[in-house]
Amino acid sequence: MIYIIRHGQTDWNIEHRTQGQTDIALNKNGIEQAELITQKIANLKIDNIISSDLKRAYMTAQIINKKFNKTIETDKRLREFCFGTLEGITRDKITQEIWDDFNKNAKQFNAETKEEIFNRIKSFIDDIKSNNINKNTLVVTHGGPIRMIKYYLDNGDNFNDKKYLAEYMTLKINNLDIFIIDEKMNLKRYDL
């Protein structure tokens, strides 16, 4: 089984700032959230933990790992999407027109394209499928990669920008939501 958790809360989450790959730590509430989720998942059998290397995910993994006592492997492929020059800006300052421009040409914002993100997430999932057979793996990452993981598992190798934007970009993922990839490689919310 593969369990996937979104990191705990940051100040930028509260401020509705676009975080992207800006390295923001958990706030006090985020630390408490991670401690609470650790209690809720304490009965899971976890063989290994893989985390995004960004502070908010890694701190979440460290707090959870106090229960499981595993070596935390970091993987840059699990980083949040790079939003380039839009990082740090509050959502109310980013108009729909700016988002539309961003979705048409992310490079003009010094950001990753969705195809680049898809390829790194695909690479991660393919590696974890082949290298973690018969292991229960806990992955700590961000909302964007979780959406892209779902897209890849639902649609396979062919990335379609319009389909992703229409069907997956709006998937609501809260801090410390848990998902599971089952034996059939379907991503589902994990209810405790």
Question: What does each model-found stretch correspond to?
Answer:
Residues 2, 133-143:
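Generic beta-sheet signal
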Residues 25, 66-123:
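Phosphate-handling substructures
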